[in-house]
């Protein structure tokens, strides 16, 4: 009898820049305790304001499909704040993942206006991303995969993925 790993013929790694697992697939299997998706209770603090809750809509118009616009910050300082919060630093403790909203509102658009805090907490319904949802339902989804790299911008994160030794 073949083991499960003997049955695997191909591994496909899909990397989506500037979108989190929760944003794209977090609503794929609602209420399934075996899937580490969104529960509907997630939020992120906003310094000096109320916590900003995760949210979704059902619209399929161009504006809804491009939330957040612009993309969240992707430089080292941005990622560090997103993971460890305001003034947080990498260390022995696990990242609190509590700085996404604070980091997003500190960015400004070309017109100098601050970004809307709720935009970075948006997620899609499976119907809004039908192709990737269908692929995820037909194949395995790894919902608890974490890179062992320090916070890095896109280039560093991508090179970590492709440098990985697959066995």
Spans of model-derived segments:
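N-terminal pro-sequences and low-complexity stem/linker regions of secreted or lumenal proteins
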Residues: 1-167
């Amino acid at each position: 009898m073949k083991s499960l790993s003997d049955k695997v013929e191909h591994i496909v790694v899909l990397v989506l820049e500037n979108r989190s697992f929760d944003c794209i697939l977090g609503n794929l299997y609602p209420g399934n305790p075996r899937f580490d998706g969104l529960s509907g209770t997630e939020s992120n603090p906003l310094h000096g304001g109320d916590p900003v809750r995760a949210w979704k809509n059902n619209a399929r118009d161009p504006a809804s499909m491009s939330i957040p616009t612009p993309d969240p910050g992707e430089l080292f300082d941005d990622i560090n704040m997103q993971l460890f919060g305001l003034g947080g630093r990498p260390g022995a403790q696990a990242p609190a993942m509590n700085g996404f909203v604070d980091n997003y509102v500190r960015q400004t658009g070309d017109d100098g206006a601050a970004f809307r805090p709720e935009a970075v907490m948006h997620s899609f319904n499976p119907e809004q991303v039908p192709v990737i949802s269908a692929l995820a339902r037909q194949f395995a989804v790894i919902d608890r995969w974490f890179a062992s790299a320090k916070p890095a911008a896109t280039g560093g994160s991508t090179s970590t993925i492709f440098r990985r030794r697959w066995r």
